[in-house]
Curated annotation (Swiss-Prot):
Protein name (record): Actin
Organism: Pinus pinaster
GO CC term (a single one): cytoplasm
Keyword Disulfide bond tagged: no
Locations listed in the record: Cytoplasm, Cytoskeleton
Length: 15
């Protein structure tokens, strides 16, 4: 949710 929200536009899969 932290970094995934920035990279995947709201998706904490990898981060």
């Amino acid at each position: 949710d932290l970094y995934g929200n920035i990279v995947l536009s709201g998706g904490s899969t990898m981060f």
